[in-house]
């Protein structure tokens, strides 16, 4: 891929991007209390005395939250720090009842790691490694609600104290596409691990986007931080718009100010929120209510043993062991639910065919990607809501494989399956869709077509071999799509010489 550059009035500019991703930890309880974490609960119904910062209430670390952070670090090949510590980040805001946030500035639980991203879906060589500086665990704040009263804002503390992983990348990205690819890959890894559901629309994963511009080869410029961006598409838009804004500002003789900004998706622009604070503004110091975290080898081994097959390893296995194309392997592993669905389909298909999975993998993958995805997309549905299960898909593939129906008829059957929820065999029987291999009937249809198209027969015999497809199509049409394509091809070749 060509390098991304912003063409200004005075020449080319390079954009430098780093992301700080806040990922809500998948856990039934909060980081330092036993309060629930379910999304969508009534305001202030999931708040403990610790979350509300009542006097005398002391935090107790949730083992599961620590475990999920360690597993995430292992999934990105990061250094796991056996000794880490919590710090207080001091600031005042109405949604922060303690007056400080418990975070990890000086000694995070996870150190340096990296993620490899593919920048072009159709080019497996378009790889780039994005460095990750650290992952630290911290509390989320509450939520201000401004639409409940004409003159007052209300506070919902359900989110207060929920565990977050802040995943801080290095400034290694150089284009909106790279930022989007990195965020998508990170979300995929988190979903595979099960440490965050990655639902950006629900706020359980959001990104702070750091952007600066410079002349190629020069030192980094002054960066701005656009807070709480909640979709991959918006992150890419922020990078593009903020970089263009900075270039225009500099070329007009202005100076980029280190500040915090917000993104307005309706106007597709960023706007200033406040000046950007430095660490000393928050007066960090070790939290006196919490002992340092000390992780032993047994705990780390437990975390490592619980990791699933990760997307890069799964993709490699699909290509090498199952013989799938790099593109198909990429599509099937980009989402953990898709990978699970495919593997269930593959197991069912192999069992019905009494063949190894490697022999039926291409058929299963092609059908899932080309047929089922396309049909679901037309309906505005997804695999999660599909009435067609992996077992039902395998039943349909078995009917194609044994010659009961043709590929074209299978498309009709799939539409009926999605419409009714019925099985493929029942639909084929009810609708009379079985494929015929009756050579007499097929031969009669071919004879009629050749007689009606004598001119094309002459052209074919004169060397215009592309017309063979025309004869096949006409025969299938005459047989209402029910003729066995193999028999049609064989008989046509005999008759056309």
Curated annotation (Swiss-Prot):
Keywords carried by this UniProt record: ATP-binding, Ligase, Nucleotide-binding, Protein biosynthesis
Alphabetical list of Gene3D superfamilies matching this protein: 1.10.10.410, GatB domain, N-terminal subdomain
GO-annotated molecular function: asparaginyl-tRNA synthase (glutamine-hydrolyzing) activity; ATP binding; glutaminyl-tRNA synthase (glutamine-hydrolyzing) activity
Record-linked SUPFAM superfamilies: GatB/YqeY motif, Glutamine synthetase/guanido kinase
Any GO BP annotation: translation
Chain segments annotated as coiled-coil in the UniProt record: none
Annotated catalysed reactions: L-glutamyl-tRNA(Gln) + L-glutamine + ATP + H2O = L-glutaminyl-tRNA(Gln) + L-glutamate + ADP + phosphate + H(+); L-aspartyl-tRNA(Asn) + L-glutamine + ATP + H2O = L-asparaginyl-tRNA(Asn) + L-glutamate + ADP + phosphate + 2 H(+)
Listed EC numbers: 6.3.5.-
PANTHER family referenced in this protein's UniProt entry, alphabetically: GLUTAMYL-TRNA GLN AMIDOTRANSFERASE SUBUNIT B MITOCHONDRIAL AND PROKARYOTIC PET112-RELATED (PTHR11659), GLUTAMYL-TRNA(GLN) AMIDOTRANSFERASE SUBUNIT B, MITOCHONDRIAL (PTHR11659:SF0)
Family from the record: Belongs to the GatB/GatE family. GatB subfamily.
Assembly and binders: Heterotrimer of A, B and C subunits.
Known function: Allows the formation of correctly charged Asn-tRNA(Asn) or Gln-tRNA(Gln) through the transamidation of misacylated Asp-tRNA(Asn) or Glu-tRNA(Gln) in organisms which lack either or both of asparaginyl-tRNA or glutaminyl-tRNA synthetases. The reaction takes place in the presence of glutamine and ATP through an activated phospho-Asp-tRNA(Asn) or phospho-Glu-tRNA(Gln).
Protein name per its UniProtKB record: Aspartyl/glutamyl-tRNA(Asn/Gln) amidotransferase subunit B
